[in-house]
Every structure is written in structure tokens, then in C-alpha cells.
Amino acid sequence: MPRNDPRLRVGLALVTGAGSGLGRALAIELAGRGLPVAGLGRRADALAETARLAGPDFHAFPCDIADFDALRAAFAKADAIAPLTLLINNAALYPHRDFLDETPESFMATMQVNFGGTLAATRLALDRFVPTGFGRILNVATFADLHPLPTAAAYSTSKGAARTLTRALKADLADRFPDIVITDWMPGMLATTMGIPDGLPPEVSAKWGAELALWHDPALTGATFEQDREILPPQGLKSKLKDALLLRRRTPRAL
């Protein structure tokens, strides 16, 4: 399949968390490539700034993705722009709280955004993709679940759940809907409010994210990329022996 599938370019790209940081950079990058972009975010003023930077192809929809009724309404309004063909699940919270300072309510509030918002946006996108059998979902992910840091219990748990969702969707959908492609992407440590001061500029990472989002290939469903390169899944002993006997080498894909 082509790296830049024209079917994606005639449809709408929807980016959650488009009011700042990586989400804003992704929206600007996609709009710069000629796609109409719907940007969701909690703050209308922040989305207005994204619109100023992205130009006329960006459409702002203030929305808290933890409010599923509001999210449904935002998707319905975005339908008027163009048929949705690309969803980038980017919105996230990182509250930096010790677990002993968490309450069930505060912990679940993070889960509601980082996992619940991703789940709900994905389900709403699939409502639009399944009738045509075509679509693209890119989930902005991390390895926080594998190596949790102190004061990050809610964040790590929620991001791990979102990565599990990608694999579960592959199991449920890949055989029936091979042209609905779902991939996890790790953008790296960024110089954003959720990142680190000396991190990568989000504008640089957004170029990789946009390139991967516009790469439509059924083989990418369930794959994980870090920055511009695929991370191959662990390989069992039997598979390793088979590859050795057949003189096969696994090669990660790159952008």
C-alpha cells in the first residue's frame, strides 16, 4: 500500500489534545500537508491559537474527551467537514501524584482521559470506518507501563491499558477489516509541559507522527513505532529457530 494513501488525504483527520504540545504540532503538520483537521481540546483559547498557527484547514472543537456525550457531539459536528478517515489519539493527563496521595476518584479521572478518552474516540471512529471498511488510527503511546516512574501510577496504568487496547483491536478486527489500520507510536521525550526541558521539539516529532499516520498498510495494525522506527515484538525460541533455519532476518520498518 502507498505510504501516503490518497484516500486519507481526501478525508478528515481528527486529533485529540490539539490545544498544545504534540497535539498542536501534529495538527499543524497535517494541515500543512493539505488535510482538513478537526482539533479537540478542553480549552477554546488554546485551540484558537492552534487554528491561528495551522491556518484555514484547522477546525476547532472544544471538548473534554472524558465527557463521552460531549465527545459524541464533537465527532458529529466534525462530520460536516469531510468523512473521517484518520484519528490520532493524543490527549493525555500526567498528574504526578504519589499513589498514597491518590483517591479512587483522582486515579479514575486520569484513567477516564488517558484510557477512556482513547477508547471512546476509537469507538466513535470505528462507527465511521466500519461501513466503508477503511480508516486509520494512530495512538500516541509510551512504555510507562513497562517501567513506571514514581508518582506516575495512574498515568502508567492508563497508558498501559491503551496499549493493550491496540492489541485487542487487532485480535477483534484485523481479519474482518484489514483496511482499518491501528498503530501505536511513541514520539520520544519531548520539550513540552508533559515532557522534559531538553527534549525533542514537538514539531520534529510531529513530522514522524504525520508520516506514520498517512502510511496505510494492513501490516501496520498492532505494530509499535518509536520516533521513526518500528520496535519489533519479542520473538519466541521456536520462531527464532525457524528464522535461523530459513536464513531469515527480521528488519524493523522505518519512516
Segments (PLM) and residue ranges:
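C-terminal helical subdomain
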Residues: 180, 184-185, 191-243, 252-253
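Conserved glycine-rich Rossmann-like NAD(P)H-binding loop of the short-chain dehydrogenase/reductase
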Residues: 33-49
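Residue(s) in the substrate-gating loop at a strand-loop-helix junction
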Residues: 142
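Conserved glycine-rich cofactor-binding loop
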Residues: 19-20
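The beta1-alpha1 cofactor-binding region of Rossmann-like NAD(H)/NADP(H)-dependent oxidoreductases
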Residues: 62-73, 104
